[in-house]
Amino acid sequence: MNKKVEGLTKETEAANYLSEQGYQILARNYRCRLGEIDIVARENGYLVFVEVKYRTNVEKGFPEEAITIQKQRRITNTAKYYLLVNRLPESTPCRFDVVVMLKEEIRLIKNAFDAYGS
């Protein structure tokens, strides 16, 4: 399976997992000139921007370690753009979650980082 197909398959698994956890999926693979967000969802009054990271092993580190400060900034800027084009107020409660997939294990990290890159 090529990387793109595998990535889409894992994102589908992550979206299904989030749905089972009570998330309402609003968009997948949201793209704009600033970047991409794997999943946009609603959960408990929050608009949640979700990054999905998958690895088959930890030779190159754990999946969540691939979310660098630069990647966080790209995601948060894309999220701000999403709010703007969807005419949502800046005061909309937002959160940045990460779905980590290592082999067959799926783990959800809520509030993994904030809009300030920490």
From Swiss-Prot:
Pfam families attached to this UniProt entry: UPF0102 (PF02021)
GO terms of molecular function: nucleic acid binding
InterPro entries reported for this sequence: Restrct_endonuc-II-like, tRNA_endonuc-like_dom_sf, UPF0102_YraN-like
Signal peptide span: none
HAMAP family assigned: UPF0102 (MF_00048)
Family that this chain belongs to: Belongs to the UPF0102 family.
The protein, known as: UPF0102 protein Cphy_2398
